[in-house]
Amino acid sequence: MSLVVLTNIPTPYRTAFFDALAEEAARAGRRFHVLYCAKTEPGRHWPYVASKMRHAHTVLRGFHPSLTGIHAHLNPGVLAELNLLKPDTLILAGSWNTPTMLVAGLNIYSPPPRRFFWSEGHADAVLHKSGLIAWLRRRVYRTFDGFAVPNAKSAEWAVAQAGSPRQVVTLPNAIDAKFFARPSAASRQEARRHLGLEGEGRVLVQVSALTARKGVLELANAFLGLSAAERRGAKLLLVGEGDLRSQLETLAVGSDGAVRVLGQLPPEEVRRVLWAADAFVLNTRLDPNPLSAIEAAAAGLPVVLSAAAGNVREVVEVPQTGFVIRDAADPSEALRAVLNASEVQLAEMGARSAELARTQFDAPAVARSLVKQLYP
């Protein structure tokens, strides 16, 4: 008996989780295999290094057309691969309308596998709430036996789209908590020295695509709109790449060093920036389940997260690990809150963040939970 995941491309956070899931599946006496539609997609900057992946996997041959920013995958051999693997459980991860995902729904062997859709969408993040696309989405959702979801918002959304009760398993985005955990108090100062931040005020960081969807311009403008007395020498670091980078760099040039655009960084450098920071910010306008906030929590940072994020309740509100941005168009109130918080308050929030990441989002814990839910 085996568990198979069909997903679009290998990403660092997914491959680390799949490595952990392979180990947990083996302990439960289950084979585990991942089918990838492609090695990468436009705009994705992670290299594919098969030697670093400890889970059995296959990169399918196929066609990968792009249209108006949508990257589709058509892998004609997916059914043949599934016929060879014959999973008892198949998890489909990615866009519901990807041609390969739709083809994988055809039952070519008996008994067919249980089919779960790994759904991170929710009502606040969906682009098409009505019309033809919404109708097609509901039709596809009704074909699934169940859903793997990261949070309560996504669970409610998926079942509503299906139109009737389905099995729901909890599958939050998993991280390597040990990788991001700050090893010592001295590491913060070392990271600050490396980034030229010695002796500065508080350091806030947002790690995201530099796009309108992530609210980066609104964040930078709101930060610069605070008075000098409110900022008290604070710095805002922006890590990532996107079509708004040039506008952000123009703001940074005129900010007298208050805003810095660091661009796309490898995971080790992102970690160093998190270690140097006092708090993490994500001013997203539309985000089903942002992983960067969880990685920041693992680094022991207070999290300032937009209410539009699907996991805001699980990551910030319930565990009280930071502050909520109620309106991504103007995050000033939340910025003032984190800048006015005492060192003791920030330390307490950071400690709760680290504990949350370790117990709820660390890859081995998430993998163990998923296997138990699928095979009780």
Regions found by a protein language model. Give the residues of each.
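Aromatic "clamp/platform" in nucleotide-sugar-dependent glycosyltransferases that forms part
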Residues: 285
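Conserved acidic donor-binding segment of nucleotide-sugar-dependent glycosyltransferases
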Residues: 317-329, 337-343
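Short acidic/histidine- and often glycine-rich active-site loop of Leloir-type glycosyltransferases
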Residues: 170, 308-319, 323-324
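Short hydrophobic beta-strand element within catalytic cores of glycosyltransferases
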Residues: 302-306
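Donor nucleotide-sugar binding/catalytic pocket of nucleotide-sugar-dependent glycosyltransferases
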Residues: 138-188
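A short, histidine- and acid-enriched strand-loop-helix "catalytic/donor-clamping" loop
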Residues: 95-99, 113-131, 143-146
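Conserved donor-binding/catalytic core segment of Leloir-type glycosyltransferases
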Residues: 4, 198-214, 220-224
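Nucleotide-activated donor-binding/catalytic signature segment of Leloir-type glycosyltransferases, i.e.
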Residues: 246-268
